[in-house]
A protein has these predicted regions:
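Residue-level recognition of oxygen-bearing side chains
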Residues: 77, 196, 209
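C-terminal helix/juxtamembrane-tail motif
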Residues: 210-224
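GST-like fold's C-terminal all-alpha helical module
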Residues: 107-202, 206
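Phosphate-coordinating loops and pocket residues in cytosolic domains that bind phosphorylated ligands
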Residues: 52, 206, 215
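GST-like domain detector, emphasizing the conserved glutathione-binding G-site
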Residues: 2-135
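Positions that flank functional sites
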Residues: 39-41, 166, 219
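Active-site-flanking alpha-helical
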Residues: 83, 176-177, 214
Length: 224
């Protein structure tokens, strides 16, 4: 490790997915170096320096130098790998093999399949697509609100998604929720429309490790 860190994390400064991996690493006190490849979000193929680690050509991808330079990509799989291997005290995760572990996994799958793609599609059509078809914008906006409704229904009955404590499942939602509610959705009041979910989100965002990483992102974006 020439940089002296245990992990190399390929990420994207404005995008959410690499940052919620960084959240997990920071929560567990694991050292890592962020690498930001020259990724054109409108391109169909990633740059060579990323494709050699992730054949999908997208971020995030993680190299674990403490485990024979093992490479893993897809944020849900990365987060699961990190907590399974390194969260031995179960600070932010549940023990493998337990029922709660599979509930945690359920929420990670929901984040990856139910939150990320729909939130990302709204960003694409709102910010990058040459046309702005209102029917498409409405579809993804409504789907985002549906996802928030799922979270609201569950969190109205319990403080955290699983295990009566904040876990990787809760944290994995944070970066997309923050980006979509502060910079993308129009005429949207998070606290008014989904008060329980908004409160839950703010508690996660205020955690010292999460705040540290998100502040780092803000500084990088400010630098251009």
């Amino acid at each position: 490790m020439s940089h002296g860190k245990q992990f190399t994390l390929f990420s994207l400064k404005p995008g959410p997915n690499g940052w919620h991996v960084a959240f997990i690493l920071e929560e567990l006190g694991l050292t890592y170096e962020n690498v930001f490849p020259n990724l054109d979000v409108t391109a169909h193929q990633g740059p060579e320096d990323l494709v050699k680690y992730n054949p999908n050509g997208r971020i995030p991808a993680l190299i674990d130098h403490g485990n024979n330079d093992f490479v893993i990509w897809e944020s849900g799989a990365i987060n699961q790998y990190i907590v399974d291997r390194y969260d031995k005290e179960r600070k932010i995760s549940l023990a493998p093999g337990t029922e709660e572990y599979y509930t945690q996994l359920q929420w990670l799958y929901f984040q990856a399949s139910g939150q990320g793609p729909y939130f990302g599609q709204l960003v694409w059509f709102a910010a990058y697509h040459p046309e702005k078809p209102q029917s498409v914008l409405d579809r993804y906006t409504n789907e985002i609100k549906r996802v928030f409704g799922v979270l609201e229904g569950v969190l109205s009955k319990q403080e955290w998604l699983v295990g009566n404590k904040p876990t990787v499942a809760d944290i994995s939602f944070c970066s997309w929720n923050e980006i979509i509610t502060t910079t993308v959705l129009q005429n949207f009041n998070f606290e008014k429309e989904f008060p329980v979910t908004a409160k839950w989100h703010k508690k996660i965002l205020a955690r010292p490790a999460i705040k540290k990483v998100w502040d780092e992102r803000a500084k990088l974006l400010a630098q251009g």
